[in-house]
Swiss-Prot record:
The 2Fe-2S ferredoxin-type domain, residue ranges: 219-304
EC category name: oxidoreductase
Residues noted as binding [2Fe-2S] cluster in the record, renumbered to the chain: 253, 258, 261, 291
Start and end residues of each FAD-binding FR-type domain: 1-93
Protein name per its UniProtKB record: Carnitine monooxygenase reductase subunit
InterPro entries linked to this entry: 2Fe-2S_ferredoxin-like_sf, 2Fe-2S_ferredoxin-type, 2Fe2S_fd_BS, Benzoxazolinone_Detox_Enz, Beta-grasp_dom_sf, Carnitine_monoox_B, DmmA-like_N, FAD-bd_FR_type
Protein species of origin: Acinetobacter pittii (strain PHEA-2)
Keywords: 2Fe-2S, Flavoprotein, FMN, Iron, Iron-sulfur, Metal-binding, NAD, NADP, Oxidoreductase
Length: 304
């Protein structure tokens, strides 16, 4: 473990059996299971060529679900912890005239291995890294040592902000834009790309924090296999409601990114808030992630 900033720690994992971890590509994440109630997704930031270890960075958030506090306060060197195999929902495009990477705060982590991959390809790329103040600039020195001419940093506390419209509008045709960071930054980048007529397939983003509205409408869920009916409250997920019936549903992340709780929809329409299903899969209304997604109407019938 390494304390990078007052709020950010880097964790290095090794397998108990001494074997290498599975291969992964830049942009991949793993699910770290702290206990039966808490599992969080974290981007892998280690070198894709060195599989002897996996590395992640965790920013302590005392107002979060408890996972980051657990990692900071209870995870010590030598402790055992369960992690999933890597999955990549934020891969680099195989082609493109240029790649613009935009990071906010801890959102820098998936870009470390991606920058190595782009450099190895000989691709044209830039990283634009925005952070609140110098003490929040985790990994900036490492990035500049490896990719100095590709890294541009912006410090809010010093009055240096990212001029997003200028950046997006000045790129050549065929540029891919990637963003990872706080939701307002992601929304701003997507809106700016749309304004300048970037095609959807050239805009890539990742955010692990839930985007589910805090004040949703209550609705009814019918479990077809067990012939049970439950009421999902406005401040409750379908998964949480089902768990009150002691029905076991596998779910690792509880954030709509891992896909383990995907459930078939037999009747009704889902309001999708996950990052796992494609837009086409969401539109088909064949399945949903019950850890974050909700009903569009008053009733859903699920294949459970």
């Amino acid at each position: 473990m390494e304390q990078l900033t007052p709020l950010i720690k880097r964790f290095t994992f090794k397998r108990q059996d001494g074997q290498n971890f599975p291969r992964f590509s830049g942009g991949s994440h793993i699910i770290v299971k702290m206990n039966e109630q808490i599992s969080n997704a974290y981007s892998l930031m280690s070198c894709t060529q060195d599989l002897s270890t996996y590395q992640v960075c965790v920013r302590k958030d005392v107002e979060g679900k408890g996972g980051s506090v657990f990692m900071h306060d209870q995870c010590n060197e030598g402790c055992e912890i369960q992690i999933s195999e890597p999955k990549n929902l934020f891969p680099l495009a195989e082609t493109g005239n240029k790649h613009i990477l935009i990071a906010g705060g801890i959102g820098i982590t998936p870009f470390l291995p991606q920058m190595d991959e782009l450099a190895a390809r000989g691709a044209d790329f830039e990283l634009h890294y925005a952070y609140r103040s110098p003490e929040h600039a985790a990994l900036l020195d490492e990035l500049k040592q490896k990719h100095a001419k590709h890294v541009f940093s912006y410090v809010d506390s010093e009055g240096c902000s990212l001029k997003l419209d200028e950046l997006i509008s000045s790129q050549p045709k065929g540029t891919h834009v990637y963003v990872c960071g706080p939701k307002p930054m992601i929304d701003a980048v997507i809106d700016c790309c749309n304004k300048h007529r970037y095609r959807d397939e050239y805009i890539h983003w990742e955010q692990f924090a839930s985007t589910v509205p805090e004040d949703g409408e209550a609705f009814t869920v019918v479990l077809a296999k067990s012939n049970q009916e439950i009421e999902v409250q406005s401040n409750q997920t379908i998964l949480q409601a089902i768990e009150t019936l002691n029905i076991d549903v596998e779910c690792l992340c509880r954030e709509g990114v891992c896909g383990t709780c995907e459930t078939a929809i037999l009747e009704g329409e889902a309001d999708h808030f996950d990052q796992y299903l494609s837009d086409a899969e969401k539109a088909s209304q064949k399945s949903m992630m019950i850890c974050v997604s909700r009903a569009k109407g008053k009733k859903l019938v699920l294949d459970l």
